[in-house]
């Protein structure tokens, strides 16, 4: 025990903590007896352990799960609500006194010893445990005693929650956005007239009337370059475009962000999605969008101290990353899994159509590797040569079969740059296939079967999805299909049904028509985690031809405190809301073929929903992207800090392949940046009834959902070698 911890143990608990403690003991006489009879913390631990073991041993399935003799979805689904609590209590005892590096506190030590904290509070009135801690423990023992039950909401209730959230296709919302567009354009016209803005492409002819200027500006609205040129880069301009609707506290935070050097980049189209005149039928409906634009105090405080969440993103050329992969350089290729690697081009693709407040690459903005200096991001003359060398990595690798081109944002590259990148991918894939003809059976490499483009522009800037871009994508799809590439995927990030606008719908239709399947990766932020919000998004996306792929917990540390929704909420959403969209296995063969006929996605999804009587296709998996080991929601809650923040121990997703190096890695510890109490208080602050979320306390165990066949790689007609290329021992 460190001196600092010893000092914390002597801190008196607050009046609120005393009140919660008294309630805890009053409801649990057996616990009170253990605590009052224990002479020290060890006796308290032994007493609790023996008590709980006596209960759990009566359920062999739960006991085997606790002992880790069984695992997986089937074993998880056999657990009762009380089993969740018993396993957590035993894990608390087994991990008592463990120290963890807490990056939420910039690497300070966090210690979990909840039974000791209760004993100190009972015996001495000390331990320094906060009310958030005691509230969590109160709910835990209620769950263990059977006083706190879980009532699954009906489908009707989930659909009632969904109906609270309008989409951007609602005629009333469309009308509001038209008003916003008019206000924004009139401000831009005024600034051009005053000479505050001068541009060689966007200007007015002498003698034009105000009506003529407005009609010309309306034409500009359909031009992606207009939105990039007139993107807001300062708090004052943002407030002006939003009709001076931002309150003084928000402006103070934004001024701090500007002073700290955090980039601002909000284009006029995306700004028009924010409410200025809040309609009675959509109060709070734009919060998931607003929280992507407006920075939090925690982000500002941590900017400059943000550490890379992704251990495998820390790369030294020639040395293995955390997952064991050797990469050619530090910036352009990222890799975690055997089958897929990320390519980040040295083009405009290093920029985005806007900066998301909870961006996973905020670390790269902090160190200047990503930015919005668009002119400086144009490709240099040496890029074509470098691209060929980078694609050589994919060509020579024995297991890579999937290339994800992202950034930044893949579609921020110009049509010409993107066409050259895709031509390079085509040549690489062709060379890889040709080289296989010379290899013996059992020695053949994986060939490229999937190409993905990572982009948020269908959301941020749907004007980018032009007929010319669709032509580039369609041409590549046609010729690449002839050499064995079978899956062409646009991987995007819709965060709210309010982002699904007529412009976004038309952009997706154009992408589908080019033969590309559009999938969505939803970030489960605080506003997006409200009851029914994620399910409504799934439904609306299905209606415009998008398949749901992942629902990601917000990753990062204290910089993303504000937007973080706890992993317990992610499990709750999976078990209680998304479940009404569960796809029966009888439709698996049908849905597996959806990407082969992307042009008919809307019709095929609609037909399947009608026949299966589902409100949406729950084809996504709720996961957290873990440092080093990838996506998983397989965890157990093994600890809790005196501030009530839970400590989760994650395992690999055993349903997919991993680097052999990861088999030797320890489990991954995640200390959540906020307690359940703090999360619920945030929800209450944005108008939610916390009683709707009552079961969240009990979801202390998670299990990754199986991947549906829709997202599996096509099978080869030959056996791929077992050998791994570019694999080494990871850097410590």
List the predicted regions and their residue ranges.
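Radical SAM enzyme [4Fe-4S]-AdoMet core and its adjacent flexible, acidic
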Residues: 13, 25, 29-51, 56, ...
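N-terminal pre-triad scaffold of radical SAM enzymes
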Residues: 266, 322-364
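Conserved AdoMet/S-adenosylmethionine-binding subsite of the radical SAM
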Residues: 387-395, 411-583
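C-terminal accessory regions of radical SAM enzymes
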Residues: 266, 575-732
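Flexible, acidic/Gly-rich N-terminal and inter-domain linker regions that tether
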Residues: 1-337
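Glycine-rich, often proline-containing surface loops adjacent to acidic residues and nearby aromatics
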Residues: 337-341, 355, 397-406, 451-454
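Conserved alpha-helical substructure of the radical SAM core
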Residues: 351, 362-403, 420-424, 428-432
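Catalytic or ion-translocation cores adjacent to nucleophile or general acid/base/metal-coordination motifs
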Residues: 335, 346-350, 364-375, 454-455, ...
């Amino acid at each position: 025990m460190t001196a600092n911890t010893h000092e914390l143990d002597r801190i008196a608990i607050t009046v609120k903590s005393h009140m919660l403690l008294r309630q805890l003991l009053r409801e649990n006489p057996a616990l009170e007896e253990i605590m009052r009879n224990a002479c020290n913390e060890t006796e308290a631990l032994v007493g609790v352990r023996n008590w709980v073991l006596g209960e759990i041993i009566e359920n062999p399935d739960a006991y085997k799960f606790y002992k880790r003799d069984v695992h997986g979805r089937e074993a998880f689904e056999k657990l009762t609500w009380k089993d969740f609590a018993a396993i957590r209590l035993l894990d608390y005892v087994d991990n008592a006194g463990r120290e963890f590096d807490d990056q939420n506190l910039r690497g300070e030590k966090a210690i979990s010893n909840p039974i000791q904290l209760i004993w100190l509070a009972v015996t001495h009135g000390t331990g320094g445990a906060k009310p958030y801690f005691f509230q969590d423990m109160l709910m835990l023992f209620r769950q263990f005693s059977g006083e706190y039950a879980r009532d699954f909401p009906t489908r009707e209730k989930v659909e009632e929650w969904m109906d609270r959230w309008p989409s951007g296709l609602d005629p009333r919302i469309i009308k509001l956005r038209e008003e916003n567009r008019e206000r924004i354009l009139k401000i831009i016209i005024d600034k051009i007239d005053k000479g505050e803005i001068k541009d060689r492409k966007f200007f007015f002819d002498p003698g034009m009337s105000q009506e003529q200027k407005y009609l010309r500006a309306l034409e500009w609205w359909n031009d992606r370059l207009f939105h990039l040129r007139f993107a807001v880069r300062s708090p004052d301009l943002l407030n002006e475009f939003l009709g001076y609707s931002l309150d003084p506290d928000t402006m103070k935070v934004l001024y701090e962000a500007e002073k700290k050097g955090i980039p601002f980049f909000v284009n006029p189209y995306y700004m028009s999605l924010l409410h200025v005149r809040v309609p009675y039928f959509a109060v709070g409906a734009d919060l998931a969008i607003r929280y992507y634009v407006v920075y939090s105090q925690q982000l500002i405080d941590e900017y400059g101290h943000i550490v890379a969440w992704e251990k495998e993103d820390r790369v030294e050329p020639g040395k293995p990353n955390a997952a064991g992969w050797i990469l050619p350089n530090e910036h352009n290729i990222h890799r975690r899994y055997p089958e897929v690697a990320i390519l980040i081009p040295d083009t405009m693709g290093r920029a985005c159509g806007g900066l998301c407040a909870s961006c996973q690459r905020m670390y790269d903005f902090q160190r200047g590797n990503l930015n919005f200096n668009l002119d400086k991001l144009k490709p240099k003359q040496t890029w074509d040569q470098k691209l060929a060398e980078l694609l050589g990595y994919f060509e020579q690798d024995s297991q890579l079969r999937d290339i994800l081109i992202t950034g930044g944002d893949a579609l921020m590259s110009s049509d010409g740059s993107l066409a050259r990148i895709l031509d390079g991918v085509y040549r690489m894939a062709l060379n890889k296939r040709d080289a296989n003809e010379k290899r013996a059976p059992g020695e053949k490499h994986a060939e490229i079967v999937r190409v993905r483009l990572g982009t948020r522009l269908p959301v941020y800037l749907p004007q980018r999805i032009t007929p010319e871009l669709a032509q580039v994508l369609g041409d590549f799809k046609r010729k690449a299909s002839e050499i064995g590439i079978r899956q062409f995927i646009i991987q995007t990030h819709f965060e709210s049904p309010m982002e699904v606008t007529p412009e976004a719908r038309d952009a997706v239709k154009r992408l589908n028509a080019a033969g590309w399947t559009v999938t969505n990766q939803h970030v489960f932020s605080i506003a997006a985690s409200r009851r029914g919000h994620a399910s409504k998004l799934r439904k609306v996306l299905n209606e415009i031809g998008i398949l749901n792929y992942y629902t990601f917990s917000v990753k990062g540390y204290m910089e993303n405190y504000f937007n973080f929704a706890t992993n317990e909420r992610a499990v709750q959403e999976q078990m209680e809301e998304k479940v009404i969209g569960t796809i029966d296995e009888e439709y698996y063969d049908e849905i597996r073929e959806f990407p082969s006929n992307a042009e008919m996605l809307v019709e095929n999804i609609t037909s399947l929903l009608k026949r299966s009587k589902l409100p949406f296709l729950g084809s996504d998996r709720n996961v957290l992207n873990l440092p080093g080991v990838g996506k998983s929601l397989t965890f157990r809650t093994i600890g809790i800090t005196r501030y009530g923040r839970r400590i989760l121990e994650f395992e690999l997703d055993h349903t997919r392949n991993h680097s052999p190096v990861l088999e030797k890695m320890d489990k991954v510890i995640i200390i959540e940046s906020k307690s359940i109490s703090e999360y619920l208080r945030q929800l209450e602050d944005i108008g939610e009834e916390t009683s709707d979320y009552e079961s969240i306390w009990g979801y202390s165990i998670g299990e990754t959902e199986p991947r549906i066949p829709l997202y599996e790689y096509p099978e080869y007609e030959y056996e791929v070698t077992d050998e791994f290329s570019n694999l080494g021992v990871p850097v410590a």
